[in-house]
Design a protein with these regions (language model features):
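Glycine-/proline-rich flexible loop or hinge segments
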Residues: 18-29, 59-70, 94-97
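Non-catalytic, polymerase-adjacent accessory regions of viral genome-replication enzymes
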Residues: 1-42, 352, 358, 366-386
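Conserved polymerase palm-domain catalytic core
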Residues: 113-215, 219-237, 253, 323
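Reverse-transcriptase-like RNA-dependent polymerase core
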Residues: 42-64, 158-172
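Right-hand nucleic-acid polymerase module
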Residues: 77, 81, 173, 177-178, ...
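Conserved pre-motif C helix in the palm subdomain of viral-like polymerases
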Residues: 65-95, 178-205
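Active-site-proximal segment of RNA-dependent polymerases
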Residues: 79-129, 133-139
Length: 386
């Protein structure tokens, strides 16, 4: 088998990559197809350090803390992306089918469908695991051991070791040398995330009746003794690998008890949008409502015209929700989103956030062409079964 870096250096491979992923990014395509890129690959194979210190930026607060994201320069980012792509293509076979994060042909939709269709799921206990700041706690030394035993390309192993040992970053103009082995923002990080618990995946497949992992979001089902054994084993693994539980998101649940997993709520075989997801939609719609009210005042638009514009905008984004229809199998969450949208249109029409907005009745919304997401959901389901 050719070296992975030999494949990346190949003109046809790079050309196919650019045509598939970089059609609207001429600058990156030019670099990937250039002689400079070929020289960078040569330097990597010679063990030279060509990755420059990324810039650390803090994102918005999440749970009272800032999230650290490392931003690499454009050329380094482009180089790391194509290497990550090649790694995922070549070494996807080493991962269990129960792992579905950052992998081609694996999705939340597939997992939820499997869970919802599992015979006896309503009688099973569930153990859900979440790691706190997963990337930040991955041990470079432990990951190196895993890489050595799973990757058969010496140049790739050498390069990945170099990445894990590279701790430099820049924050507020000053250079530091105490960064984590795995940096959020590095295109290789998803591969590292998947690889770090690869042995855990293999073991949990044997211990639980149902087991799935998305990076550090883990869910499994079985009998109560099975889940207790899985919880005990997970604690051992986390202690050994230096990982920390997110205690608020790690628990054993009774049969049919609601479990929040990613953006969903699972209650046995029932799958719905989570409260957090619906609240995120509420915040987004509220911001957009303020934008439409501002435009209405600025241009002196009529109530009806403003509502029509808002409706047109909302319905143009229905495709986002329709993509999620195959995942959920109840309309409770969809109905809540419908009410959020209806209230937003009423607010846009009346310029009132109070109960005064309800002078616009549902019949008026229908006359303007409003269609509920619930009706779109059932149309989708019926079309699927025709």
């Amino acid at each position: 088998m050719n070296s992975l870096f030999s494949d990346i250096s190949n003109f046809e491979y790079r050309n196919e990559y650019c045509n598939k992923y970089l059609l609207n990014d001429a600058e990156t395509s030019e670099y990937i197809m250039s002689h400079e890129f070929e020289k960078d690959i040569e330097f990597i194979c010679l063990g030279k350090q060509i990755i420059e210190a990324p810039i650390l930026k803090l994102s918005n607060k999440v749970g009272g803390r800032y999230r650290k994201i490392y931003h690499f320069n454009v050329q380094n980012l482009s180089l790391l992306k194509i290497i990550a792509h090649a790694l995922n293509e070549r070494y996807d076979y080493i991962f269990s089918d129960n792992l579905y994060s950052y992998r081609k042909n694996f999705s939340v939709k597939k997992v939820c469908k499997r869970i919802g269709n599992t015979k006896g799921i309503d009688d099973m206990y569930c153990y859900k695991v979440d790691a706190s700041s997963y990337d930040q706690h991955i041990s470079g030394d432990i990951l190196k051991t895993i890489i050595s035993s799973t990757i058969d390309d010496k140049n790739v192993v050498k390069f990945l070791f170099q990445i894990l040992d590279f701790k430099k970053y820049i924050y507020e103009g000053r250079e530091y040398n105490d960064g984590p082995a795995v940096m959020t923002g590095n295109p290789l990080t998803p591969f590292f995330d998947n690889l770090y618990l690869i042995d855990y995946d293999d073991e949990m497949r044997k211990k639980a009746k149902i087991y799935y992992r998305y990076s550090d979001d883990i869910i499994m089902y079985g009998t109560l003794p099975q889940m207790q054994e899985c919880a005990s084993y997970t604690k051992e693994v986390f202690n050994k690998k230096g990982l920390i539980f997110n205690e608020t998101k790690t628990n054993i649940y009774k049969p049919k008890e609601t479990v929040r997993y990613l953006s969903l709520e699972l209650s046995g075989s029932k799958i719905d949008f989570s409260k957090q997801y619906i609240n995120n939609i509420r915040r987004l719609v509220k911001r957009k409502t303020h934008s439409f009210l501002k435009i209405k005042r600025q241009y002196g638009l009529s109530d009806e015209l403003t509502m029509k514009c808002a409706l047109k905008f909302i319905e143009s984004n229905y495709g986002f929700f329709i993509k999620l229809f195959p995942i959920v199998n109840t309309t409770n969450g969809i109905a809540k989103i419908d009410r959020i949208i209806q209230d937003a249109i009423r607010t846009v029409g009346t310029s009132k956030f109070s109960n005064g907005r309800y002078r616009i009745k549902y019949g008026q919304l229908k006359k303007l062409g409003y269609k509920t997401l619930v009706s779109e959901y059932y149309s989708f389901k019926w079309a699927k079964h025709e």
